[in-house]
Regions:
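Short beta-strand segments
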Residues: 36, 62-64, 106
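Short acidic-glycine-tyrosine-enriched beta hairpin
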Residues: 61-79
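Short beta-strand His + acidic residue motifs that chelate non-heme Fe in jelly-roll/DSBH
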Residues: 37-38, 57-58, 74, 80-87, ...
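Glycine- and acidic-residue-biased ligand/ion/polar-headgroup-sensing regions
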Residues: 43-56, 60-61
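Double-stranded beta-helix
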Residues: 2-9, 81-117
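A short glycine-rich, His/Asp/Glu-containing loop-to-beta-strand
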Residues: 2-40, 44-45
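A generic "binding-loop/recognition-motif" signal
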Residues: 32-34, 43-44, 62, 78-79, ...
């Protein structure tokens, strides 16, 4: 099996665990009290399962609490972000992307705590 690199980000890190022509799977870890940018993708949809922890998920105009075992569908073109609400524990997410392109340049950021817009 292929060993994939860990990619560090200001909010945590991710590791790609599977990649094919139309599917990419990642494990994402969000550090306590950190959040991903508010973003959308033009060329992929995402399916998330919360493996460990809890957070607040924004999809479109709605925000809701998510916790272990929760499933989130993010349609192509839909703005989204997740925040780890824990003071001390990581938020771990399994992410499956379906689409035609998985490059990091298909992340269109709207808001970002780390000045990456």
């Amino acid at each position: 099996m292929h060993s994939f690199e860990i990619f560090n980000r200001p909010w945590g890190f991710y590791k790609t665990v599977f990649l094919s022509e139309f599917v990419q799977a990642k494990i994402i870890q969000v550090f306590p009290k950190q959040q991903l940018s508010l973003q959308y993708h033009k060329k992929r949809e995402e399916h998330w399962v919360i493996i460990k922890g809890q957070g607040m998920m924004t999809i479109g105009e709605s925000t809701r609490e998510v916790m272990e075992g929760g499933y989130i569908f993010i349609p192509k073109g839909c703005k989204h972000r997740i925040k780890n609400t824990s003071e001390k524990n990581p938020l771990i997410i399994s992410e499956v992307q379906l689409g035609t392109y998985f490059g990091e340049d298909d992340i269109i950021r709207i808001e970002d705590d780390y000045n990456r817009v």
